[in-house]
């Protein structure tokens, strides 16, 4: 392999890696992973208008973000989302970020444009 071929393949590998790494923060559905500190600022500024807790009822009853709406991933529907404007910022959260991402993607699938999620539990944004 000559130097030009090596650099070509190294560049391609780097681009592919960077692309996949970026998907962690920007999914194809239009949702976005944000830090807890950014979420706090966006809630305070009004950029995020709704906080949706997608955890189970047991987890919700144990504690939740003040003013959050309880909507587990399996009950997210167009009907349940009717009270939200499709241009409002929505933040989903759970305990680890996995269900929050699934919930965010489900909400975005109903045409919501500004849907964010965080890794970690609600207490990280208190």
Role assignments for model-derived ranges:
Residues 1-50, 54-62:
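Flexible, polar/low-complexity N-terminal or interdomain linker segments that lie immediately upstream
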Residues 37, 66, 98-102:
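A broad detector of short, well-ordered amphipathic alpha-helices
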Residues 51, 68-70, 115-117:
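Conserved beta-strand scaffold positions in the cores of enzyme catalytic domains, especially
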Residues 61-63, 81-82:
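Short histidine-centered beta-strand/loop micro-motifs
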Residues 64-66, 111:
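Short, structured coil segments at secondary-structure junctions
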Residues 77, 81-126:
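Catalytic cysteine-centered active loop of the rhodanese-like fold, especially the PTP/DSP P-loop
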Residues 73-74:
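Non-transmembrane, membrane-adjacent beta-strand/coil modules in membrane-associated proteins
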């Amino acid at each position: 392999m000559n130097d030009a071929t090596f650099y070509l393949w190294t560049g391609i590998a780097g681009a592919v890696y960077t692309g996949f790494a970026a998907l962690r923060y920007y999914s194809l559905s239009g949702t976005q992973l944000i830090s807890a500190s950014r979420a706090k600022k966006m809630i305070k500024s009004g950029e995020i208008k709704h906080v949706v807790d997608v955890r189970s009822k047991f987890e919700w009853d144990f504690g939740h973000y003040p003013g959050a709406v309880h909507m587990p991933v399996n009950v997210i529907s167009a009907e349940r989302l009717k009270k939200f404007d499709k241009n409002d910022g929505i933040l989903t959260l759970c305990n680890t970020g996995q269900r929050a991402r699934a919930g965010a993607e489900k909400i975005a699938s109903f045409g919501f444009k500004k849907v964010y999620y965080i890794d970690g539990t609600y207490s990280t944004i208190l």
